[in-house]
């Protein structure tokens, strides 16, 4: 033995295994840049294709106007012919269903929603004609499919994970509420789409604004200045794009303005927090009094201009409802505002009339659903039901049922609501920016309706904030999944729980899909879906 040599007494280090076998396999599968690019784009494309199949399959069934299609499809058809919504004879639906689609009148129809959503429906009518029920619904189906792609890309930006993005898109693709609202030609799917597009623009603006604010402050401090308030950032193209998107949402339904207001407030808060992180003393005052007015001017006027543009057909024609109101004796404004052109006086009167209609709407309806019960999924909307006889519509032995019920996948919905409630707690504890942004989407789509619990409203309005519920659920799934650096036990458990949840959600969607797509089923099978008495 060499003098002075020492013998190590340190034993082998017991290193706990990390990750899972699935992680190892996935790592080998994506071991090349080409494969990673394929997953990066292929995953979102695959869930979008799945969404397209579920929304387009047998889209023309039933060949009958469903629920509020009686208003919006016929309005869209007259928009194509007149540029404004015109009236129809009473009880005209049977004729329209039978292909006699040109019985409309030249008299204007009183409509209480802006025209944009109906113009979108009209695109399908223009391509396929009004005698083809596929043409009635194709625009809405395409919009619903594109919404899945947008949500997937938004989720990847939020969570920096293609896996979580694909999970979010998959849940949106297979959810029944999203499927039904993409398979009927009504307005709310378009409202959801444009609001989600605005959300995506707000997300992009958040990073754009933060980077430029930091650069401007660094430049000021490098020059020896000591700014207390910080600069105003005027060039914010993503914010302008958000204004366009929210204006388009409002051009479908006025509730699009809820998203404009909610995210307008959100932008002030985000700017204040960004200035505080950058060490500005007057961060709150600067956000409200300095950047706030600039943000308002970049967002709100843009939205209003886009909203007004959605009424172009009404402005450029002469026969729209109330189009010539101000020109009738005794109606024109007098005094301070007498200079306002008559067309604008008529327009403002029409908008006031629409507002009065909505706030006073309290007519009973069998599927009216109080907003207080929306999150519990108490009263979903039955949009269409038929009992075909033996030998008709694929019924092998009566009694049979065909239904279009706008009900979410119950597992996905209730899990998403629970996740959103957890995110409220998490926001209080952690202040994560992703959590705040997601909850603002939920709040903008849901909370304003709590002011109107006495009005006639419906569960299907929740499509407007469904994407944000799904983002909340995806956020929680990400927490359950954990990271590759977690212990093997924790990581394997997280993967297993997530896999079981996704499999159960898929099975339930397969179970419910016939009732989302007007597929003929035995009456006993339809009855199996009445989990609550209020679901009938």
What are these regions (language model features)?
Residues 138-159, 197, 419-423:
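Transmembrane-helix motifs of polytopic, lipid-linked glycan transferases
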Residues 65-66, 136, 140, 180-190, ...:
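Short acidic/glycine- and proline-prone juxtamembrane loop motifs at membrane-interface regions
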Residues 1-54, 290-303, 492-498:
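Start-transfer (signal-anchor) and selected internal transmembrane alpha helices
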Residues 58-97, 284-287, 294-295, 303-379, ...:
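Aromatic-rich transmembrane-lumenal/periplasmic boundary elements in polytopic membrane proteins
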Residues 2-9, 230-241, 246, 271-275, ...:
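Transmembrane helical bundles and short interhelical boundary loops of multi-pass, membrane-embedded
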Residues 51, 168-173, 180, 246, ...:
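Short helix- or helix-capping micro-motifs
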Residues 16, 22-25, 158-159, 198-238, ...:
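Membrane-interface transmembrane helices that cradle and orient dolichyl/undecaprenyl
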Residues 46-47, 151-174, 211-217, 231-232, ...:
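Transmembrane-helix signature of polytopic, membrane-embedded enzymes
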């Amino acid at each position: 033995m060499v003098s002075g040599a020492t013998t190590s007494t340190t034993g082998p280090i017991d290193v706990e295994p990390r990750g899972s076998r699935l992680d190892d396999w996935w790592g080998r599968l994506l071991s090349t840049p080409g494969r990673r690019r394929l997953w990066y784009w292929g995953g979102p494309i695959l869930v979008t294709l799945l969404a397209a199949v579920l929304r387009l399959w047998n889209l023309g069934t039933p060949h009958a106007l469903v629920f509020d299609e009686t208003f919006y499809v016929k309005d869209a058809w007259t928009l194509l012919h007149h540029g404004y919504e015109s009236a129809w004879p009473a009880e005209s639906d049977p004729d329209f269903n039978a292909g006699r689609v040109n019985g409309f009148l030249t008299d204007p129809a009183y409509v209480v929603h802006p025209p944009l959503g109906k113009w979108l429906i009209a695109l399908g009518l223009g391509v396929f004609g009004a005698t083809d029920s596929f043409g009635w619904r194709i625009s809405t189906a395409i919009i619903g499919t594109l919404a899945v792609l947008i949500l997937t890309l938004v989720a990847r930006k939020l969570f920096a994970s293609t896996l979580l993005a694909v999970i979010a898109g998959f849940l949106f693709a297979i959810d029944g509420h999203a499927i039904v609202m993409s398979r009927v030609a009504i307005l709310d799917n378009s409202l959801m789409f444009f609001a989600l597009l605005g959300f995506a623009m707000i997300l992009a603006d958040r990073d754009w604004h933060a980077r430029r604010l930091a650069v401007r402050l660094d430049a000021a401090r490098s020059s020896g200045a000591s700014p207390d308030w910080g600069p105003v950032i005027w060039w914010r193209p993503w914010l302008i794009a958000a204004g366009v998107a929210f204006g388009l949402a409002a051009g479908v339904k006025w509730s699009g303005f809820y998203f404009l207001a909610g995210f307008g407030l959100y932008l002030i808060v985000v700017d204040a927090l960004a200035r505080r992180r950058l060490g500005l003393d007057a961060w709150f005052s600067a956000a409200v009094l300095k950047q706030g007015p600039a943000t308002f001017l970049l967002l709100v006027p843009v939205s209003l201009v886009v909203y007004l543009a959605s009424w172009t057909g009404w402005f450029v024609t002469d026969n729209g409802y109330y189009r010539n109101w101000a020109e009738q004796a005794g109606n024109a404004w007098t005094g301070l505002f007498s200079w306002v052109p008559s067309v604008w006086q008529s327009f403002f009167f029409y908008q006031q009339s629409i507002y009065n209609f909505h706030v006073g709407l309290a007519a009973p309806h069998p599927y009216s659903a109080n907003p207080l019960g929306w999150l519990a999924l108490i009263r979903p909307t039955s949009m269409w039901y038929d009992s075909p006889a033996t030998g008709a519509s694929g019924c092998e032995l009566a009694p049979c049922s065909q239904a279009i019920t706008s009900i979410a996948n119950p597992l996905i919905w209730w899990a998403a609501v629970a996740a959103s409630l957890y995110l409220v707690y998490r926001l209080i504890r952690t202040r994560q920016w992703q959590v705040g942004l997601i909850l603002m989407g939920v709040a903008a789509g849901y909370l304003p309706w709590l002011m109107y619990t006495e009005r006639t409203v419906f569960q299907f309005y929740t499509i407007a904030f469904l994407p944000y519920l799904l983002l909340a659920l995806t956020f929680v799934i990400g927490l359950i999944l954990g990271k590759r650096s977690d212990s093997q036990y924790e990581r394997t458990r997280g993967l297993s729980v997530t896999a079981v949840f996704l499999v159960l959600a898929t099975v339930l969607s397969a179970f419910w899909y016939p009732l989302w797509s007007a597929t003929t089923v035995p009456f006993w099978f339809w009855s199996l879906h009445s989990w609550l008495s209020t679901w009938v």
